[in-house]
Amino acid sequence: MKVSEKGQLVMFKTLLATALVASASFSAMALELKGHLTQGGLVTGKLENAKSVSLNDENLKLSAQGDFVFGFGRDTETTHTLKWVDNNGKSYSQPIAITKRDYKIDKITGVAKKYVSPPKEVSARISREAVAVRKAREVNSDLLYFLDPVLKPAEGRISGVYGSQRYFNGEPRRPHFGLDIANKTGSPVYAPISGTVVFAEPDLYYSGGTLILDHGHGITSTYIHLSKLDVKVGDKIEQGNKVAEIGATGRVTGPHLDWRFNWKGERLDPALLMQDTLANKK
């Protein structure tokens, strides 16, 4: 069965059954998926009695209860394959089609020159910091907080969206991978879901004050341009705990929170996760 969605919240359950020719017995496995089948989307799944599951031949962490999660990056292909093996060694395959998104063009002026074309003397620092951030996002713990509804981490105006192609002072740069929430410096930032602090640095070159939380199975969330960090690496954070304060550190033109969600190396759209929360309240 081919699954295709127009990017909206999708919830489906399919029963995959195989008649056993050698006997009159009958075995079946139910696959449940919830999330957004679109670029930038996060999808949670559940399979009972499965011993392994993979997406495009990449193994996914599987909880004792059969929970797993995966996501799609900004420019990922639109066709994917989910495979799994049950406890009896039977293999299954599920094609998945996702929608392609169009992204806005975001032209930003007034950015300090040192952040548009950094001087050579800071190149080693930038590379070192990028490696540290990537390492923090490689965490693949057994936590299951990614199953919980996601709350908005700060009050304020949405000033930037996921996926937009950015131009700084007229020069093209990498797309934006977060959701920007503008508010005054010192405004509180709260944990949108529970997790563990895996990265907390007050002064990175591009992102300024930077915080990363682990939510399990390769899902992390990132908070940047912070003026103050209230937590440290190793802290266990409950949903709604104050973790930081909005700032204007790093490459910015004004105070705001740049909030990001990640599945391993893929950047996901936080706005879609908040849509899920709103849908659950209806």
Regions found by a protein language model. Name each.
Residues P188-F199, V231-I246:
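Short, well-structured beta-strand-loop connectors
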Residues T38-G40, E48, Q65, E77-T79, ...:
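Extracytoplasmic
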Residues M29-D102:
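Cationic-aromatic interfacial patches
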Residues S4-L16:
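Bacterial N-terminal signal peptides that target proteins for export
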Residues P192-S227, P255-F261:
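Zn2+-dependent peptidoglycan hydrolase active-site motif and core
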Residues D235-T253, W259-K282:
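Extended, charge-rich intrinsically disordered regulatory tails
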Residues P95-S207:
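Surface-exposed, glycine-biased beta-strand/turn segments
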Residues A22-A28:
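N-terminal signal peptide c-region/cleavage motif recognized by signal peptidases
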